[in-house]
Swiss-Prot record:
The lineage of its organism: Bacteria, Bacillati, Bacillota, Clostridia, Eubacteriales. One of its GO terms (cellular component) is cytosol. It comes from Clostridium perfringens (strain ATCC 13124 / DSM 756 / JCM 1290 / NCIMB 6125 / NCTC 8237 / Type A). Transmembrane segments: none annotated. This is Bifunctional protein FolD. Pfam families: THF_DHG_CYH (PF00763), THF_DHG_CYH_C (PF02882).
């Protein structure tokens, strides 16, 4: 039995949906446009922005790549965001983080129009999300839920354990599992008896950024294991879960790479295709 939950496979289907949608739009004389802002020249962010651009172009979405000098003032960055907010041709805005230390990240992200905030960064967007109002879904948590549903894995009534309580993954994922009527426990660095808690999980999600931290001793026989973490070890990308050790015990498991991360950018672009929600 193949135990692999492949984000790549699921992404192929979603990309097809996006491509069909944008072709229909263009046939009617319309188009979609995303503006992506990069401040500075962080290597990881440069790579990610280039990847976003390539994927968007392949799927028929116009992509504006905005590169700003690391020394830009906070005020000028705010002016740029306000300009994009007012531009009716821009359907979505992405601001690559982190920002330079002299810029107040919270103040800047809160300026992004919630109706264009593809990454769900602003406090208005986050508020809408937690209140269950219409908003763009946080992409990494949404990737986890999308992957589970694509493989017809039952969530309702299941015991879910999330290791990690970050604002980007753990907390919004907690809410999304609640919305699916799961019973959810969130673990963190102060959790006592972590192994015992993890062994209760029907679905175990790990998002702590510690390479190979979770081995089979944390996993209940037959559990579904979702690895959100990515770390570089000896030049290779690896996850938070010791894949080889856990594979035999899990009923299904995501690889790293090729799992959750393979879906995130695709779902980010799908966010701008509102009729596909």
């Amino acid at each position: 039995m193949d135990k692999i939950l492949s984000g790549k496979t699921v992404a192929i289907d979603i990309k097809g949906q996006i491509k069909n949608y944008t072709e229909e739009l263009k046939a009617s004389g319309k188009s979609l446009k995303i503006s992506s802002i990069l401040v500075g020249d962080d290597g990881g962010s440069v790579y990610y922005q280039n990847f976003q651009e390539k994927l968007a172009n392949n799927l028929g979405i116009d992509f504006e790549k905005i590169k700003l000098d690391e020394s830009i003032s906070e005020e000028n960055l705010k002016l740029k965001i306000e300009e994009l907010n007012k531009d009716d041709s821009v359907n979505g805005i992405m601001l690559l983080l982190p920002l330079p230390k002299h810029i107040d990240e919270r103040a800047v992200t809160n300026l992004i129009d919630a109706d264009k905030d593809l990454d769900c960064l602003s406090e208005v967007s986050v508020g809408r999300f937690y209140k269950g109002e219409k908003c763009f879904m946080p992409c990494t948590p949404n990737s986890v839920i999308t992957l589970l549903k694509a493989y017809n894995i039952e969530i309702e009534g299941k015991e879910v354990v999330i290791i990690g309580r970050s604002n980007i993954v753990g907390k919004p994922l907690f809410q999304m599992f609640l919305n699916e009527n799961a019973t959810v426990t969130v673990c963190h660095s102060r959790t006592k008896n972590l192994k015992e808690v993890c062994k209760r999980a029907d679905i175990l999600v790990v998002a702590i950024g510690r390479a190979n931290f979770i081995d089979s001793s944390y996993v209940r026989e037959g559990a579904v294991v979702i690895d959100v973490g990515t770390s570089e070890v000896n030049g290779k990308i690896t996850g938070d879960v010791n894949f080889d050790d856990v594979y035999e015990k899990a009923s299904l498991i995501t690889p790293v790479p090729g799992g959750v991360g393979s879906l995130t950018t695709t779902l980010l672009l799908k966010n701008v295709c509102k009729e596909l929600d």
